[in-house]
Amino acid sequence: MGTVVSLIASELMGLVDELVVMDSLSTDGTAEAARKAGAQVHSVADVRPDLGVRPGKGEALWKSLFVTTADLLVFIDADLTEWGTHFVTGLLGPLLTDPSVKLVRGFYDRVLDSGNVPSLEGGRVTELVARPWLALHRPQLSRVVQPLAGEWAIRRSVFEELSVPVGYGVELSTLLDVHASFGLDAIAQVDLGRRAHRHQSLHDLAVMATELMSVGERRRLWTLASPTVGVEGSGGTLGTAVLRLPAADRTWKVLPIPVDERPAAIGVEGYFRAQGFED
């Protein structure tokens, strides 16, 4: 993360107004490295503690709305091992040049473990869960090359209006919700070249897949006239799925998986004060 931050800080600060790292109790020195490299580092638990804290990537992105003010938001995964600052400029480009674009999703050649071979295939969860679900329920989105790409950009005015899953479902939810509200032409894709990142175990991917299924099923049941059905108050929806995975000792590994969603930030008391306005 320190390398990512330092490159952005040295090459793009004429373009990037705020460089923020949301830290979810990391223990690998990520926060300190990012701070030394020039980023504003915020502990997720310390941002609006009155709203509580939930584990997950989506929680960090949702809370980033309370500590940033920029009109355009670019999200970059922290586990990248191969990337360039063109990720940022590439994702911002469509938003800066076309007012009708609301969401930009990156795609790239993923570096696979076997022989360092690049491929346009998505990860295992993309190919086995997300892409089949889209083919069945949102076929218009089947041409999105990597629907779960962790590198994407969005207009604040759009993201602050969306319900946000607290976990890994945030990429799928934004894709589905922007498509539902603005149509296919509001979504752009950018070829970012080549990307490498750390890979996860199958058990970790099972957790991700469960969260994605929750996001998809919830939105399948929503109507366009009422896109925030079930989002309650400033705490959002509450829910936990229980995933049981067979362990090596012939017992069950029981994993409670939060499938909460945070509500649209724009409706949360104090949000406008964070932007420098009165509620």
Model-based region annotation:
Residues 24, 76-79:
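Active-site acidic Asp-centered loop
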Residues 49-53, 57, 61, 83-156:
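Acceptor/aglycone-binding surface of glycosyltransferases and processive sugar-polymer synthases
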